[in-house]
Swiss-Prot record:
Annotated active site: C83 (nucleophile), H172, E174
Binding sites annotated in the UniProt record for ATP: S226, G227, G228, I229, D230, S231, T232
Signal as UniProt keyword: no
Keywords: ATP-binding, Glutamine amidotransferase, GMP biosynthesis, Ligase, Nucleotide-binding, Purine biosynthesis
Taxonomic path: Bacteria, Pseudomonadati, Thermodesulfobacteriota, Desulfovibrionia, Desulfovibrionales
Gene symbol of the encoding locus: guaA
PROSITE patterns according to UniProt: GATASE_TYPE_1, GMPS_ATP_PPASE
Recorded metabolic or biological pathway in which this protein acts: Purine metabolism; GMP biosynthesis; GMP from XMP (L-Gln route): step 1/1
Annotated Gene Ontology cellular component terms: cytosol
Species of origin: Maridesulfovibrio salexigens (strain ATCC 14822 / DSM 2638 / NCIMB 8403 / VKM B-1763) (Desulfovibrio salexigens)
EC annotation from Swiss-Prot or TrEMBL: 6.3.5.2
Protein name per Swiss-Prot or TrEMBL: GMP synthase [glutamine-hydrolyzing]
Job of this protein: Catalyzes the synthesis of GMP from XMP.
C-alpha cells in the first residue's frame, strides 16, 4: 500500500515534541502531532509514511505511564523512538527496561555505529555530543535489533532493526544541543522512510485559498484584525479567496504603540484593498481601566471589553456566517495533546476567545502552521518586512507596560519612549537580532538634575531579550553605545522622564513582560 508523504508524531508529554515536528517541516516534509492516547484507527486512516514516538517525563516501569497501542508498530512504516519512545519500543517488543542509578541529564558523549542508516554522513559519529534527559535505561534490546550506539554510562543508547526500519535513540536529536541532530532526523525521513520534500509555503498558500473558497462558498466572514502578523496573514489569505466578502474589524483600544493603527491599516487598505472598519474605543477602554493597578484585572477588563465591542460590531453586519481566527498549530496541539507535566508553563496574555452565542462557524486558515511558517507565508503573499518581522506585542497592549494606574498622560510618555527604543534598534540593525525590545514605564519617580534645576520625574526600564519561542529568554547583550543613545534620547526628548534603567533578568525566573 502506498503511504502518504507525511510523518505522524505521537506525543508522550515531552517538552521537545514540537521541535521534532518543526525539524521535519524544515526539511520540507509535512508532519503532525497527535496525543499518545489517540484512537489507533485515526492514525491508520491518516496513512503516514513514518511514525515517531516522542520522549516524555514518565517511566515505562510505572503502572499509570502512557502506553503505545501495539498495533501501531505493525503498520509496516518506519518507526523512530526517542528517549521514552525508545523505552516503550523496547518494552513492547520484548526487551527490558530498568531504572538507572546513573541518570543522564544534559550533554553526553555518544559513540555511534556509522553503518547504521540514520547515522550516515556524520563524520564525528564515534564522538558525538548529544542531549540526554532520562532516568530509566534499556538493559536488553528486543530480538532482531542491533546496538547502534553507546555512552559511557549506558550500553544501549541507540538500537535498530534495519530490516523492519525500526530505530530508537535514548538521546534527543531534535534539540540544538545535539550535534548533527538535524542530519539524524533527515536520514530517518529521507533515507529510511523515502519521503519527499514537497511541503512548501507556496503550495500551502495555493491549497489554503482553494480550501477557503470551497468552505465559505458565497457567505460573509468577519475577522478581528489586530495588526499582528497572524491576523494580517489570515486577512490577506481570505481576501484572496473571497474578496470583499471579508469584513475586518480593527478595535483601537487606546493602548496601541505610536502610529500603529495608521501604519498597519493604511498599508492593508492601500495595497490589498481590504474592507477594514476601525472602531475607536479608546475612551471606553480607558474609562474601564480607571483606577485599576492589578495586572490580572487589567487583562480581564481589556479582554471582556474587547469581546463586547467586537460582538456589537460583528452583530451589526448582515449575512455573516463565519468568524476567522489566527489560530496556529501550537494552539491546536495544546488543546489536543497528552497532558503531561510539560503541558503549560505560562498562560498567554493575548485577548481571549469570543462569546459562544455569536453562532458563527470558525475559519482558521493557519491552524496547520508554526510561527516561523506563518512568516514564510507572509513572504509568499508579498507582505512587507515591517509587518513580517514585527516583534510580539501582547493582547492587552501598553496596559501591561504601564505599571500601575493607566492614564492618557502615562501612556503618551511610554509611547514616546518606546518609539525611541524601536528607532534605535532599527537604525543599529539590532531589531531583527533580538526577540523583543521595548520600554516599560515604572510606577515611581526619582530625583534628578537638569541644568541647574532639581527634577522629580518618571523612570523608564528597557527590556530587550533573546529567545527562540518565548518559553525561555535571556537579556540581549546589546552594545553599550546603543543603550546609551536610547537613554540619552529618552531623557532629553520625552518630557517627564529623568532616569532609564536596564532589565538584565532572564526567563525564568522573570517573565519577558513586567505584568
Amino acid at each position: 500500500m502506498q503511504h502518504d508523504n507525511k510523518v505522524i508524531i505521537l506525543d508522550f508529554g515531552s517538552q521537545f515534541t514540537q521541535l521534532i515536528a518543526r525539524r521535519i517541516r524544515e526539511a520540507g516534509v509535512y508532519s503532525e502531532i497527535h496525543p499518545c492516547n489517540v484512537d489507533p484507527q485515526k492514525i491508520k486512516d491518516l496513512n503516514p509514511g513514518a511514525l515517531i514516538l516522542s520522549g516524555g517525563p514518565s517511566s515505562v516501569l510505572e503502572d499509570e505511564s502512557p502506553q503505545l497501542d501495539p498495533s501501531l508498530l505493525e503498520l509496516g512504516v518506519p518507526v523512530l523512538g526517542i528517549c521514552y519512545g525508545m523505552q516503550l519500543m523496547t518494552n513492547d517488543l520484548g526487551g527490558r527496561v530498568v531504572s538507572s542509578e546513573d541518570r543522564e541529564y544534559g550533554r553526553a558523549e555518544f559513540k555511534g555505529d556509522s553503518s547504521c542508516t540514520i547515522f550516515e554522513g556524520i563524520e564525528d559519529i564515534e564522538k558525538l555530543t548529544v542531549w540526554m534527559s532520562h532516568g530509566d535505561r534499556v538493559e536488553a534490546i528486543p530480538e532482531g535489533f542491533k546496538v547502534c550506539g553507546t555512552t559511557e554510562s549506558i550500553p544501549f543508547a541507540a538500537m535498530a532493526n534495519e530490516e523492519k526500519k525500526m530505530y530508537a535513540l535514548q538521546f534527543h536529536p531534535e534539540v540544538a544541543h545535539t550535534e548533527s541532530g538535524t542530519t539524524i532526523i533527515n536520514n530517518f525521513v529521507f533515507k529510511v522512510a523515502g519521503l519527499k520534500a514537497d511541503w512548501t509555503m507556496s503550495s500551502f498558500v495555493e491549497n489554503c485559498i482553494e480550501e477557503m473558497r470551497e468552505k465559505i462558498g458565497d457567505n460573509q466572514v468577519v475577522l478581528g484584525l489586530s495588526g499582528g502578523i497572524d491576523s494580517t496573514v489570515v486577512a490577506v489569505l481570505l481576501h484572496k479567496a473571497i474578496g470583499k466578502r471579508l469584513h475586518c474589524i480593527f478595535v483601537d483600544n487606546g493602548l496601541l504603540r505610536m502610529h500603529e493603527r495608521e501604519e498597519v491599516i493604511g498599508f492593508l487598505e492601500e495595497h490589498f484593498e481590504l474592507n477594514v472598519k476601525c472602531v475607536d474605543s479608546a475612551e471606553l477602554f480607558l474609562d474601564k481601566l480607571k483606577g485599576v493597578e492589578d495586572p490580572e484585572k487589567k487583562r480581564k477588563l481589556i479582554g471582556y471589553t474587547f469581546i463586547d465591542v467586537f460582538n456589537e460590531e460583528a452583530s451589526a453586519l448582515k449575512d455573516v456566517k463565519f468568524l476567522a481566527q489566527g489560530t496556529l498549530y501550537p494552539d491546536v496541539i495544546e488543546s489536543e495533546s497528552f497532558k503531561g507535566p510539560s503541558a503549560v508553563i505560562k498562560s498567554h496574555h493575548n485577548v481571549g476567545g469570543l462569546p459562544e452565542d455569536m453562532d458563527l462557524d470558525l475559519v482558521e486558515p493557519l491552524r496547520e502552521l508554526f510561527k516561523d511558517e506563518v512568516r514564510k507565508v507572509a513572504y509568499e503573499l508579498g507582505l512587507p518586512e515591517f509587518i513580517i518581522w514585527r516583534q510580539p506585542f501582547p493582547g492587552p497592549g501598553l496596559a501591561i507596560r504601564v505599571l500601575g494606574e493607566i492614564t492618557e498622560e502615562r501612556l503618551e510618555i511610554l509611547r514616546q519612549a518606546d518609539k525611541i527604543v524601536q528607532n534605535e534598534m532599527h537604525a543599529s540593525g539590532w531589531y531583527r537580532k533580538v526577540w523583543q525590545g521595548f520600554a516599560v514605564l515604572l510606577p515611581l519617580k526619582t530625583v534628578g538634575v537638569m541644568g541647574d534645576d532639581r527634577t522629580y520625574e518618571h523612570v523608564i526600564a528597557l527590556r530587550i531579550v533573546d529567545s527562540i519561542d518565548a518559553m525561555t529568554a535571556d537579556w540581549s547583550r546589546i552594545p553599550n553605545d546603543i543603550l546609551a543613545r536610547m537613554s540619552n534620547r529618552i531623557i532629553n526628548e520625552v518630557k517627564g522622564v529623568n532616569r532609564v534603567v536596564l532589565d538584565i533578568s532572564s526567563k525564568p525566573p522573570a517573565t519577558i513582560e513586567w505584568e
